[in-house]
Design a protein with these regions (language model features):
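Charge-dense, helix-prone N-terminal extensions
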Residues: 1-132
Length: 132
């Protein structure tokens, strides 16, 4: 059974109606493949973005998915702490905590490297989360 949040994220993605729909939809599928235990949420709803920002978490935020006119941006909450041997991060590189990947129209996704980055983000979150 699909959750209300999953349905709202579906609606947000479907509402894009262009290359961004396919890109964000594919990234979402890859996140779920990389971490079947991921939690999907919508955060930070506001008048200009009433559905909010799709957010994927596991022991803390992994990444958020935002769409702009010319790009789909995935921002990794602890990106500065992650190994990125494939050099996927191409935005927010000077931040002390976050890192982002901007996907533009016509660009491919290195699916293997992307899923490895998601796995690393989960591992970092689990290592930093308080133990019960």
């Amino acid at each position: 059974m699909m959750s209300d949040v999953a349905e709202r994220i579906d609606a947000k993605i479907e509402g894009l109606g262009d290359w961004r729909r396919e890109t964000l939809g594919r990234l979402r599928a890859l996140i779920k493949q990389a971490d079947p235990e991921v939690t999907e949420e919508l955060k930070w709803a506001k008048a200009s973005n009433p559905l909010g920002v799709p957010t994927w978490s596991h022991a803390g935020i992994i990444c958020t998915g935002e769409t702009y006119r010319d790009k789909v941006k995935l921002t990794f909450a602890r990106g500065a702490s992650l190994e990125d041997p494939s050099r996927l991060f191409n935005s927010s590189l000077d931040g002390g905590t976050r890192r982002a990947i901007d996907f533009r129209e016509g660009e491919g996704i290195d699916e293997k490297a992307f899923k490895a980055l998601i796995g690393e983000a989960v591992a970092v979150n689990l290592a930093k989360s308080p133990k019960p």
